[in-house]
Every structure is written in C-alpha cells, then in structure tokens.
Amino acid sequence: MGKYMKKSKITGDISVMEVSKATAPSPGVRTRAAKTLALKRLNSSAADSALPNDSSCYLQLRSRRLEKPSSLIEPKQPPRVHRSGIKESGSRSRVDSVNSVPVAQSSNEDECFDNFVSVQVSCGENSLGFESRHSTRESTPCNFVEDMEIMVTPGSSTRSMCRATKEYTREQDNVIPTTSEMEEFFAYAEQQQQRLFMEKYNFDIVNDIPLSGRYEWVQVKP
C-alpha cells in the first residue's frame, strides 16, 4: 500500500498537493478511526492552503462559489431641521387648524338646516295630501250619491269605498223579497187568523156575515 500515492484536487487556481504516506512503515495495523482522522487533517490543511491572502469578494468552498455581500452600507444622515422652522410650521398648522374648525362646523350646520327644511317640506306635503283625502271622504259620502260612476274622485280609496257600497247595496237588493212574495206570506197568516176567529166567534169578518154557533150576532143600526 505504500507504493500508491493519493492526490487531492481543488477546482480553481489552487495548486495541487500530493501527499504520500510515510516511508517508514508504522508498526501495527492502522484502524479505521485513525484513517478517518488522517483524512480530516489532510482536508483541513488543504483548505487552509487554498484560502487567498488578500480579502476578495468571492469565497471558494469545495465546488460552490459564493458571492460575499458588500458590507459597506451608506449610513443614513438624519435630516437637519431648524428650530425656527419647527416653530413656524407648528404655528402655521395651529392657525390652519383653528381656521378650519369653524368652516367644518358651518358646513355641518348648513347640512343640518337643509335636512330640517327638507323634512318640513315632506311633512307639509304629506299633511296636505292627508287633509285633501280626508276632505274628499267627508264631503262626498257614498251613501247620498245615486250614481258614483259619473263623479270623478281624486283618490283611489274613495273609488274602492264606492264600489264596496255598491256591492253591498246589490246584495241587500237581492236579499229583500218582492211584493208578491210578501203578499203570499201575509195572506197565509191572515187566512190562519180568519179561520181561528170564525171557529171561536162564529162570524165571517171578510164577508161581514154572522154564522151559526154558540154566539148570536145582532145587527146594530146607527
């Protein structure tokens, strides 16, 4: 094993290092732990030799090239503010705020006044409409008008009321019996009363004639 040489290459402008084992054979057998330790030492020595002397902006680690970010950051200079400018701006802002307050209040007052006027106008219109409808209802009752179709009413409510009253009167006309039906009804009752009177007092009230029976009728002359 001492005849072979181990070579380690690193990409870039790095010199190749050749490491050979010691000529004098070490007594005993090299263990695996000792072998790994020797490899670690070899790699660390190669990395130390690979580092450049001057500070460049690139770092070379194994097979990757990393770019070093620039550490020079321009410090932010605080803005220079004069005390007089601060005082003047503060006074101006105060004056502007003081002057702007009554303008906002006046605009709010104008809006409130406009809303109040619009509410009053809308309420007045509603009251006028209600009074006109109320006057039409009171001045034109449907019970005293014979033909409501000839009249022209401003509101639809009066028309609906007139239609309802017409339908109600028609229903009442249909319910009321005719004269012939009333005569038939009372004729039957009169016949019953006449029959009972004739049986009790033996007198015919229709023909004004006395009948034979328990009572004796005498004609009285004036």
Curated annotation (Swiss-Prot):
- Write out the transmembrane intervals: none
Q: Which GO terms describe its cellular component?
A: nucleoplasm
Where in this protein does the record put region Disordered? 68-101
Report if keyword Thylakoid is assigned.
no
Keywords in alphabetical order: Cell cycle, Nucleus, Protein kinase inhibitor
Note the Pfam families from the entry: CDI
Stored InterPro entries: CDI_dom, CDI_dom_sf, KRP
Q: What does this protein do?
A: Binds and inhibits CYCD2-1/CDKA-1 complex kinase activity. May target specifically CDKA-1.
Q: Which named protein is this?
A: Cyclin-dependent kinase inhibitor 3
Gene that produces this protein: KRP3
